């Protein structure tokens, strides 16, 4: 029988490989020449040498090693914060799966494979599925952490009133 930490690790790994696999499959299609143009969104191939909005692109090849250190450091931290990891295994799986996929791009292609270009009314940075999964994972984690804790504290307060 698996304990809760082992179950959380399995959930984390499942989400990790799902996000990683979907992202790499989409990027493969883009690299093979898939493109799309419309009035709102274009699918175009761009190699991003930096991070969000091409920041830190001046680090060039060193950026991928910095990102590996950050990913490993965060993973080690989470393995020591078992309650945080167990309660947010899905979100962390999303963030890590997407992050590792983007780092792999840096090693294989020299930059992150970006392709979604939103340009209706204004030009937005070109991004990819992994970027969206990182944003969604962090957003859900913050919402759950903030609202769940507030709700839990209110319930504890109400329970202590009736004791």
From Swiss-Prot:
Its EC number is 3.4.23.36. It is a multi-pass membrane protein. The chain crosses the membrane at residues 10-30, 36-56, 58-78, 84-104, 122-142. Pathway: Protein modification; lipoprotein biosynthesis (signal peptide cleavage). Its main location: membrane. GO terms for molecular function: aspartic-type endopeptidase activity. It catalyses: Release of signal peptides from bacterial membrane prolipoproteins. Hydrolyzes -Xaa-Yaa-Zaa-|-(S,diacylglyceryl)Cys-, in which Xaa is hydrophobic (preferably Leu), and Yaa (Ala or Ser) and Zaa (Gly or Ala) have small, neutral side chains. GO terms for biological process: proteolysis. GO terms for cellular component: plasma membrane. The keyword Protease applies. It is found in: Cell inner membrane. The active site is at 114, 131. HAMAP family: LspA. Belongs to the peptidase A8 family. NCBIfam families: lspA. This protein specifically catalyzes the removal of signal peptides from prolipoproteins. This is Lipoprotein signal peptidase. It comes from Helicobacter pylori (strain J99 / ATCC 700824). The gene is lspA.
């Amino acid at each position: 029988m698996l304990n809760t930490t082992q179950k959380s690790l399995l959930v984390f790994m499942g989400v990790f490989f799902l996000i990683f696999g979907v992202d790499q499959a989409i990027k493969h299609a883009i690299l093979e020449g898939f493109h799309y143009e419309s009035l709102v969104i274009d699918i175009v191939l761009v190699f991003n040498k930096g991070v969000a909005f091409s920041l830190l692109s001046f680090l060039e090849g060193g950026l991928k090693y910095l990102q590996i250190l950050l990913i490993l450091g965060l993973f080690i931290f989470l393995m020591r914060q078992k309650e945080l990891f167990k309660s947010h295994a899905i979100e962390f799986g999303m963030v890590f799966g997407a992050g590792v996929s983007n780092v792999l791009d840096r090693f294989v292609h020299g930059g992150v494979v970006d392709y979604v270009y939103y340009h209706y009314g204004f030009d937005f940075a070109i991004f990819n599925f992994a970027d969206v999964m990182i944003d969604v994972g962090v957003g859900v984690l913050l919402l759950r952490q903030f609202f769940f804790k507030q709700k839990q504290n209110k319930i504890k307060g109400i329970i202590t009133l009736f004791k």
